[in-house]
Amino acid sequence: MKRTLLCCLTLLSCPFLYADEDTQLRLNQSLDQTLLQEQRQFHEQGTIRSTEQLPKLQINGQEYSVEQNPNDLAKALYLAVMQKQWLKATVYLEHYKKYVGYDRALTDFAEGAVARSQGQLKLAEQKFQSSLKQQPHNLICELELARVLFEQQKNKEAARLFISIQDQLKQSDPAVIPSGVLTTVNTIVQALKKRDSWQGSVSAGYTYVSNLNSSSEQSKTWTLYGRDSEGNMIPVREVTRGTPKAESAIGLDYEASLIKRYAIEGHHGVALRALAFGQSYNDHATFNESTININAGYSYFDLKNQIGVSPLFEHKRYGNDGLYNAWGARAEWMHFISADKAFKLEAESKDLNYQKYKTLDGVESSAFATFWKIFPDQWTFFGGLDVLDHSTQEKYMAAYQQQGVRLGLSKSWSTGFNTTLLSSYRWRLFDKYAETFLARRHDFEQNHTFVVQMPRFEFYGMTPNLTYRYNHNKSNVDWLYSYDKHNISFKLEHRF
């Protein structure tokens, strides 16, 4: 019994129960920020008003009067759409539709273009498809429809149409279709291939840790009392408990992240996301640590939203032995508020099955909210809140609730460096009062991570990456759980 309690205390004093949260959050944050930066800017929206007087059409700085007849209005409407003069196009459209026998293919095309300019992509898609039904093989209309499909993340349909357009453009008359259009189409086709390709990163390098065993380097003494022959309380003996000296070590630090989405039809698809990270120390193998987290399931993408629901699996090793396996479920929703702002909600629950320490078996449920804002000059701010409930069979020293705040700032510098600063603050309250500590444990943990990527020194596809992390934990059970830790690593990273 005493040995079991001692092992349990030793185990619970190790930070692996919650210390890798920042690494996992940082890797996910990097993937999500990449998605945000890849989003295309929407067309500028404007208020459309009608007028009885026909505005003059402006082309290449010259103004042309438009007469009130169907021929003039049809030409002016088409040219206004192609010149992206949306207010004028709307006026021409209104007047043109008053004439009997107007060209429905033209008006549907114009209405689709105006709808696209306002961000109404579903309506734009319907109008372009209607126009093509009346006038099949209209290359300009096909091109606009393909763009709308691309912007709505309907990757499979967009790719099919763009490839067809590519073939037509190669055989078209440059006098009718400018050669620059083919260049644009080629660029979008490449973007579609990248969007549906495997993306991620892998990095490895050396790391130095100043307090590998997360020791407080403190001790505490208790006085045990008993009663004498007369029944009075007297001190019997003193018991001192303490933590070992902090150990430093040099080892291998490695990380990998991977995402892949398979478009099935329309907005629907299947997505995979996998993370792997850990550290290995030659002279301190008992502190080796690694984690693999995989989730794959249903994915919905459109212009403004990305939704995913999937099962997940996580495997963690500690000291070269399997620590636990976990199965669970994950749901996420990322909303692109505008071209420079995004918001994400995540929730997951996993059933932890420890291979040796069965009293730690339980369910961990968590929820995260994150906001991104891109500023001029390639500054990006992100921040978030998180809550977590970690329940275990052992209710006194391992089960807890946690609330956290995250703040971060990243910047791409013109000198060929990228920097990211991430800080997290967590408040952890354990479930019950523990007689062992004569306290109900509560911790305040803070982590500060600074990452410098050096693309200017890239060679053979490898980018140098320097990461510094400071971890501070303050506990009311100070002698056992309070500690400071510094970690610095230098890795080579390959992104694909």
UniProtKB/Swiss-Prot annotation:
Protein name: Hemophilin secretion modulator
Major localization listed first in the record, in broad terms: membrane
SUPFAM superfamilies: TPR-like
Signal peptide from the UniProt entry: 1-19
Description of the deletion phenotype: Knockout of the gene abrogates HphA secretion. In a mouse pulmonary infection model, the mutant shows a small decrease in bacterial lung burden and systemic spread.
Family affiliation: Belongs to the Slam family.
Record gene name: hsmA
GO cellular component, one term: cell outer membrane
Membrane topology: Multi-pass membrane protein
Location of the protein in the cell: Cell outer membrane
Domain of life from the UniProt record: Bacteria
Keyword Transport: no
Transmembrane parts of this sequence: 198-208, 253-263, 268-277, 291-301, 305-315, 327-337, 341-351, 365-374, 380-389, 403-413, 418-427, 446-455, 462-472, 486-495
Known function: Part of a high affinity heme acquisition system. Mediates the secretion of the hemophilin HphA across the outer membrane into the extracellular environment. Plays a supporting role for full virulence.
Induction behaviour: Part of the hemO gene cluster.
Keywords assigned: Cell outer membrane, Membrane, Signal, Transmembrane, Transmembrane beta strand, Virulence
Lineage of origin: Bacteria, Pseudomonadati, Pseudomonadota, Gammaproteobacteria, Moraxellales
